[in-house]
């Protein structure tokens, strides 16, 4: 059992709190029973897990997860018992939940995840422009998966999608949603014109000319969401075929990026679901 916060395995997990550590190790940190359960459900086994068996043993869900951890260990995965203070030392969360693990970035590469998703003739893409807030990023990734977005493209100056706070807010989206990050706007533009070519590129902004729900979002569509404070950059705006807005009442001027993206993406999902059902 790991009892010391200076144990090499604890240091290995702590290194994943920062981007350079994640890049050097090829790993990212997941924390808490929900995320570890989500990884197992996605057939992803962490490269290293530390866990407190007493904490997990206090609930039915925790005991079930403990069985999966021990099963993975029996199959050769590294899973080590640790005391609560040791887990707290490894954790980025304010309130550690009895388990932390390191997952290989190679296991969530976008091309690998795309193999497990159905290809569509009318894809829905999401591009993020200098999105800085980790909570917003995680919320958007979670909504993108729920709304069946095909791929998320992250432009320059976006927060690292594998930062611990983003991963926690994403609530398991990272295990299913293809995310391409560190892209230039030229590379994103090339993705829009690749096969199948995107028919409309929408930029969401308060001064948009068209209400988001007045467009046909069943087309091959890309949505661009801009920086929380400054909106979309000139490079991103240059790709747009339409500027859209979300009508609001009672003198509310704007929504945060996470909510705005979710509203528009779920309208696209609604239209696509209705289109697949056909006329009543």
Annotate each language-model stretch with its function.
Residues 1-94:
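N-terminal positively charged helical leader segments and presequences
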Residues 2, 28, 129-130, 155-156, ...:
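Glycine- and other small-residue-rich loops at beta-strand/loop junctions that grip anionic moieties
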Residues 32, 132-139, 255-260:
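Amphipathic alpha-helical repeat scaffolds
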Residues 33, 54-56, 86, 106, ...:
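Short glycine-rich anion-binding loops that position phosphate/pyrophosphate groups of nucleotides
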Residues 71, 85, 102-208:
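RNA substrate-binding interface of SAM-dependent RNA methyltransferases
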Residues 101, 143-147, 158-174, 234-280:
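Structured adenosyl-cofactor binding patch, chiefly the S-adenosyl-L-methionine
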Residues 202-252:
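Active-site/ligand-binding-proximal alpha/beta "capping" segment
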């Amino acid at each position: 059992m790991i009892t010391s916060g200076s144990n090499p395995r604890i240091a290995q997990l702590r290194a994943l709190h920062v981007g350079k550590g994640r890049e050097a190790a090829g790993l990212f940190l997941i924390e808490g029973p929900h995320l570890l359960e989500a990884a197992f459900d996605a057939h992803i086994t962490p490269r290293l897990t530390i866990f407190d068996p007493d904490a997990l043993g206090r609930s039915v869900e925790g005991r079930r997860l403990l069985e999966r951890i021990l099963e993975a260990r029996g199959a050769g995965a590294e899973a080590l018992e640790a005391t609560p203070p040791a887990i707290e030392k490894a954790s980025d969360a304010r309130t550690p939940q009895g388990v932390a693990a390191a997952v290989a970035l190679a296991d969530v590469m976008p091309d690998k995840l795309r193999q497990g998703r159905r290809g569509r003739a009318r894809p829905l893409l999401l591009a993020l422009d200098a999105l800085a807030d980790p909570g917003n990023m995680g919320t958007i990734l979670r909504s993108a998966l729920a709304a069946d977005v095909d791929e998320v493209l992250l432009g320059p100056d976006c927060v690292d999608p594998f930062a611990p706070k983003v991963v926690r807010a994403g609530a398991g989206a990272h295990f299913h949603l293809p995310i391409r990050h560190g892209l230039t706007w030229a590379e994103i533009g090339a993705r829009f014109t690749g096969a199948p070519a995107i028919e409309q590129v929408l930029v969401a902004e308060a001064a948009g000319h068209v209400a988001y729900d007045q467009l046909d979002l069943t087309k091959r569509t890309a949505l661009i969401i801009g920086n929380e404070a400054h909106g979309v950059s000139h490079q991103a705006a240059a790709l747009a075929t339409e500027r859209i807005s979300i009508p609001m009442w009672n003198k509310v001027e704007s929504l945060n990026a996470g909510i705005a993206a979710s509203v528009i993406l779920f309208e696209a999902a609604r239209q696509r679901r209705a289109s697949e059902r056909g006329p009543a």
